Amino acid sequence: MKASQFLFATLKETPSDADIASSQLMVRAGLIRKIASGLYIWLPMGLRVLQKVERIVREEMQNIGAQEVLMPMTQPAELWQLTGRFNDYGPELLRFKDRHDRDFVLGPTHEEVITNLAQGELRSYKQLPITFFQIQNKFRDEIRPRFGVMRAREFTMKDAYSFHVDQASLAKTYDEMYDAYTRIFTRLGLDFRAVQADTGSIGGFASHEFHVLADSGEDDIAFSDSSEYAANVELAESVSMAERQPATMARENIDTVNMPTCEAVAEHLNVPLATTVKTLIVQGHTPEGEPQLIAVVLRGDHTLNTIKAEKIEEANVPLMMATEEELKAAGLHKGYIGVELNMPVFVDRAAAALSDFVSGANEINKHTTGMNWERDAHITRIVDIRNVHEGDPSPDGKGTLQIKRGIEVGHIFQLGDKYSQAMNCTVSGEDGKPVTLMMGCYGIGVSRIIAAAIEQNNDENGIMWPSTPDISDSLAPFEVAIVPMKSKEDTVMETATALYEELKALGINVLLDDRNERPGVKFADLELIGIPHRIVVSDRNLAEDKYEYVNRRDSEKQLLSRDEVIAKVSGK
C-alpha cells in the first residue's frame, strides 16, 4: 500500500476523553474514531488490525472443526423469555419493540439463538458433537462505557457453541477449545494466563478465562510462580499456612472504646493484625429454608470473598449482610461481634488455624484476648471464604502465588443442559429415546484483544505491536514501512519501489511512505502506529549499496544490504 493513497489519520494531541493508553493511542494512531459514548468507527488502519485478529481466530476455530455461521444481532425476545434471561440479564440487555409491537433485543450473546438453531436442525446423536462459531458485533448497554474499545457498548466478538450427547464429549471439545485459545493468544504474541473462573450470568459448571496481563486490567488474577496453576482472585483457593497450636493464654475481656476495627484493636494491644479475627453476620437459611442469620469469621488481615461465601449452603444468594435491625434483635453490636454465637459459625481456614487470638466480646466497646477454638467457641464448618494474598502458598503445593491485573480477552464455559433443557433441545439417542443436549460456549473479545495488546505493548512514542513467532501473524497494520528520502534523482524512489514490490511478493504487508511530508513527520507517524520494521532509502546509503534499518522495539539504526534487510523483515 502506498501511503499517499491511504488514509493517515494520526493526531499529535491526546484526546481529552481517552482515559487509558490504548484508548489514547488508538485514536492518535488513526485506528478508531468515537461517534458516541461506547461507539466507534474502525478506520482503514484499525480495520487492518481487526481483520488480522479475525483471521487468526477463524483459522484456529476451523482447525478444530468448528463451522462458521452468522446469526442476526437482533433477536426475538421470546427466545430469551424461554430461558428466563429476558428479565434476569439486567439493563445491559437493550430491549425494544418493532412497529408491530413485538419485543426484540440487541444480542449481547447468542446462546438462545444457537440453541434454537440446534433444536431445528439437529435430529440424531450421529450428527454430534458439532461446534458452530461466528465473528460478529455484539451490543451491551454499558452504564458507563470507558477505556475505548476495551469496554464499548458495541464490540466485535467471536462466539462459539458446541452440542453433545454427554458430558464426556463436552469435556473433550472443551479441552480442544482451551488448546485452540492458547494457540490464538500465543500466535498473537500476548503475555497471557488461562485462569479458573466463575460462570457468572451465562451459567454452567466449569469455566476458564484468558487474561492478558496489564496494569490497567480490571480483574485480579492469581497464579503460581512455579506451576501452571492460575485462577481469578474470585475463585483462587486459599490454603492455611500453619496448623493450630495449643492454647497458652487464658481468655480476658478488655476495654476497646471506640475501636470497632481489627486494625485499631491490634494497634491498641500491640499485637499483629493476623492474630485478630473479625466476625461478619450475613443473611441465611436453615436446611428447611427458614430464614436465619449465620456468622462468617476471617482473620483480621484478610478480606471476604463474596463469591466463595455464597457457596456456603446456608448462605443466601446474593450474599447480604445482616441489617442494623437484625443485629439489634440478635443482641449484637457491629465492630464488637465475637465468635461465641447462637447461630451457625463458618470459619475461614486461616482463622481456624489461630490460637490465642483476639475477637469481639459481643459487648459494645469490648474485645476478648486469648480466645481459642473448641475451648471457647464452636466451629460449625471450616470453609475457604477469603481473598488470596500475594505470597500465599499455591493450592497445588508448587511455589507461591503472584497477583497481577489482567484484561479478560476470552472465556470458555461448560454450560451443561441449562439452555437446552429450557428450550427443549433434544436429539434421538442410540436407543431411539430423546436425549437433552449438553452445551459449551466459548467467547473471544476480538476488538478487545487489540486494546489489550496495546496496553501491554507501548512506549512514549506510541504503539509497539507484540512480537509474534510468525511475521504473518503480526497485529501491526503493516509489518514494514519503506521511507524514500527526497532526492533530485529518481534512483531513490525507483529502488524503494522495487524493494516494496519484492517484499509484497513475499507475502509481507508493506507500506511505501511516499507522502509529501518531512522525514521527521513520517518517522513519528510510523512509531505512533507501531510499524515493526522501518527501512529508509537515501542517496547517501545507496552509494554504499546499503539501507537504513530500524526496529520499532529498540530504535537501533543499522546499515544493511538488500539481502540482510529482506532477511530481517521476513525472519528468514
From Swiss-Prot:
Organism: Psychrobacter cryohalolentis (strain ATCC BAA-1226 / DSM 17306 / VKM B-2378 / K5)
Assembly information from the UniProt record: Homodimer.
Protein EC: 6.1.1.15
Gene3D superfamilies: Anticodon-binding domain, Bira Bifunctional Protein, Domain 2
Xref: SUPFAM superfamilies: Class II aaRS ABD-related, Class II aaRS and biotin synthetases, YbaK/ProRS associated domain
Entries under InterPro entries matching the protein: aa-tRNA-synt_IIb, aa-tRNA-synth_II, aa-tRNA-synth_II/BPL/LPL, Anticodon-bd, Anticodon-bd_dom_sf, Pro-tRNA-ligase_IIa, Pro-tRNA-synth_IIa_bac-type, Pro-tRNA-Synthase_IIa_type1
Highest taxon above the source species: Bacteria
GO BP annotations, alphabetical order: prolyl-tRNA aminoacylation
Function: Catalyzes the attachment of proline to tRNA(Pro) in a two-step reaction: proline is first activated by ATP to form Pro-AMP and then transferred to the acceptor end of tRNA(Pro). As ProRS can inadvertently accommodate and process non-cognate amino acids such as alanine and cysteine, to avoid such errors it has two additional distinct editing activities against alanine. One activity is designated as 'pretransfer' editing and involves the tRNA(Pro)-independent hydrolysis of activated Ala-AMP.
Alphabetized Pfam families for the sequence: HGTP_anticodon (PF03129), tRNA-synt_2b (PF00587), tRNA_edit (PF04073)
GO cellular component: cytosol
CDD domains (alphabetical): ProRS-INS, ProRS_anticodon_short, ProRS_core_prok
GO molecular function: aminoacyl-tRNA deacylase activity; ATP binding; proline-tRNA ligase activity
Gene, per the UniProt record: proS
Enzyme class: ligase
Subcellular location(s) per record: Cytoplasm
Family: Belongs to the class-II aminoacyl-tRNA synthetase family. ProS type 1 subfamily.
Main location per the UniProt record: cytoplasm
Official protein name in the record: Proline--tRNA ligase
Key words, A-Z: Aminoacyl-tRNA synthetase, ATP-binding, Cytoplasm, Ligase, Nucleotide-binding, Protein biosynthesis
Domain writeup: Consists of three domains: the N-terminal catalytic domain, the editing domain and the C-terminal anticodon-binding domain.
